[in-house]
Amino acid sequence: IIGDLGNFPAFRGGVAMGPYLQEKFGIPVYINNDGDLFAYGEALAGFLPEVNQTLQLNGVTRQYRNLLGITLGTGFGGGVVLDGVLLRGDNGCGGDVWCMRNERYPQMIAEEGVSIRAVRRVYQEESGQDVEGLTPYDIYQIAEGKREGNPQAAKEAFRQLGEVAGEAMANALNIVDGVAVIGGGLAGAGKYILPGVVAALKGTAGTFGGNAFPILQMDVFNWEDEADREK
């Protein structure tokens, strides 16, 4: 840990976390960020093998080998696995999506629209209510009608998050050309986030000649939607 990070208040001045944990537990330790490791786990023993097994059981011979993993939480994380190998990149930045351009606010990074702070900001803008003390879970509860507040504003906060995430994912998927899986603390609000994600992934972009093309060259299916999955 190089910097003095808010997420690690007990570690200051630079801590060699890998060697520390290895000595502490007596086992090999591999250190990486949550986005990379989420993607790696889903590729080796999670979503990717689940998709391939389901296809196989239904008589489909095609198998997927590449995966984009996205984490929604304090920030906007990502990781890429290509044919079983985690994409590290020459500078350790492989799969980083947080600093892509924000589709709603092009002068901002994507993470300003895909994060805990984004959910709170949009809810406050849409509802006109102070969000002091409100967590994303509280806002989810408002969307569900289980807590006092503005349900439509709460749903819109998650939808906008999905829209910005979906645009960034579309850019990444055009390069990765594989399946995508979403996780992280905010993923529990998936019923309100996924519509924005899917709508963005199914978006189009035009040419000066007046033609419109899908922003993704491949078809988009929501694995959580049974009707989509059967396609």
Language-model features and meaning:
Residues 1-14, 28-30, 42, 72, ...:
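Short beta-strand-loop/turn "lid" adjacent to the catalytic site in phosphate-handling enzymes
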Residues 29-67:
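Conserved phosphate-binding catalytic cores of ATP/NTP-utilizing and phosphoryl-transfer enzymes
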Residues 69-71, 76-81:
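Short beta-strand scaffold segments in enzyme catalytic cores
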Residues 19, 23-27, 50, 54-62, ...:
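ATP-binding/phosphotransfer module of carbohydrate and carboxylate kinases, centering on a glycine-rich
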Residues 1, 36-39, 77, 187-190:
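Short, active-site-adjacent cap segments at secondary-structure transitions
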Residues 6-7, 91-92, 102:
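Short clusters of small/polar residues that mark proteolytic maturation junctions
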